[in-house]
Amino acid sequence: MTDLTAQDAAWSTRDHLDDPVIGELRNRFGPDAFTVQATRTGIPVVWVKREQLLEVGDFLKKLPKPYVMLFDLHGMDERLRTHRDGLPAADFSVFYHLISIERNRDIMLKVALSENDLRVPTFTKLFPNANWYERETWEMFGIDIEGHPHLTRIMMPQTWEGHPLRKDYPARATEFDPFELTKAKQDLEMEALTFKPEDWGMKRGTDNEDFMFLNLGPNHPSAHGAFRIILQLDGEEIVDCVPDIGYHHRGAEKMGERQSWHSYIPYTDRIEYLGGCVNEMPYVLAVEKLAGITVSDRVNVIRVMLSELFRINSHLLYISTFIQDVGAMTPVFFAFTDRQKIYDLVEAITGFRMHPAWFRIGGVAHDLPRGWDRLLREFLEWMPKRLDSYEKAALRNTILKGRSQGVAAYGAKEALEWGTTGAGLRATGIDFDVRKWRPYSGYENFDFEVPVGGGVSDCYTRVMLKVEELRQSLRILQQCLDNMPEGPFKADHPLTTPPPKERTLQHIETLITHFLQVSWGPVMPAQESFQMVEATKGINSYYLTSDGSTMSYRTRVRTPSFAHLQQIPSAIRGSLVSDLIVYLGSIDFVMSDVDR
């Protein structure tokens, strides 16, 4: 692993023409083979020819200090985009976001496509986790993925017509015909849900016996949401399985094109409904990159404090429900007592509990109330002893350890191939935590450790890492309590939304700006920005494209749970059904995070 302290800040926002990988690409493919796009993403964005895509991807994967993870892959409808100076002509585009762990650097490849020739080769030959991303790209934009092993809808019903993220596709329910569910349509939808093993390359049996095909979900309590897995069983052994997602899809990325930069903030809370302010962080930071806003140290620490409170809140639910899945009920009731204390604190600060929508472009909604420090101090005195009791009473239990140790185990290579992040990746021995490697919101000023496993990620290791992460979050909260800076809770910037209230009472120009920004939304410069954060379940990121409007031209939301569920078949083949239940409990996912 590379010594991170000796590296340049690759995550900072600047033009990446000087990134070493640009020179490596030009040395291999020629100086005129690419168009390098200047953005505010903080990573090099390189347009490549479709015919060279796989060759370039293979080159990056085999470099010294290679790009080993496909972090994200999706598309964009470019037809209505007006600010495209210096970019290749394109009606649509597909982007491929790759990460090099050893370099601590990313690169984004883009392919320009004509409306009359919408096709790209499948990336699954290089990265197996491209499978689901390519299915969604085809589904949302109609871009054909040549050579894909199973190009079918993934978020929408199989009977759905059209490609929802195209600019000519309606965004409001009132633009559709009224919905009617006739008996014939109901029968058609039920038939579309019938699983046919042959469609997935599965055999119905061997020469000696038939396999059983079993639906787990979409309403099974151990599925942790509206989630269906079709199991191919030989007795109790899982021969193969097919995860079926999309039941919770709400069109979050399409909504981003209809809401202002400001009014989209409440939607971010609901992408992963347990994460609260953690989900607001990447979106707000990405918008602030577009606007060129720098917030005060006080805002940074407040944001970190709220994020870590929600991290603890989410981890407590995860740990207790994992224990419940294995067979113990008591820790769940303990956890909800502890989580109530967090909600009391969050409500005192923000006015809300689960979904505060409290971060703002340029700051936070209001300053900390009187008494916040007392509530936080009481929680910090309470929680460490409770954590010890969870570990002593349940997590050291020999039955729990016997059910979870060595189950659904994978190494670093498999984790990187499937885009695994968070505790699942760190359990394999890779200490990739965005708060440490690419610090944001002042995390570089906090003293905390990153828990790392011993080389194999199994169910027990993943849950124990989360316990240690809770302790580290408590350390961070203690530092927030002891070192809360003075200063404004909103930046003095024309695009801070809404501007500080007291200024609106003194300056008519500020009052007019307040009215326009709240009613229509702030106008962001035409640019692209990107921000990833260490969320509760792995790395969450927002990739925003502005066309100089009050609304986002394209809002791409990359969630960790989507990648983690795609990994299920590879990790669970050959195990028992009872092992699958433990594995699902160890992943830490919610379906809103998967389906968006």
Swiss-Prot record:
PROSITE patterns noted in UniProt: COMPLEX1_49K
Region of interest: NADH dehydrogenase I subunit D: 210-596
Pfam families: Complex1_30kDa, Complex1_49kDa
Transmembrane feature ranges: none
Cross-referenced Gene3D superfamilies: Cytochrome-c3 Hydrogenase, chain B (1.10.645.10), NADH:ubiquinone oxidoreductase, 30kDa subunit (3.30.460.80)
GO cellular component: NADH dehydrogenase complex; plasma membrane
Annotated spans, NADH dehydrogenase I subunit C: 1-186
Assembly mode: NDH-1 is composed of 13 different subunits. Subunits NuoB, CD, E, F, and G constitute the peripheral sector of the complex.
Name by which UniProt lists this protein: NADH-quinone oxidoreductase subunit C/D
Gene of this entry: nuoC
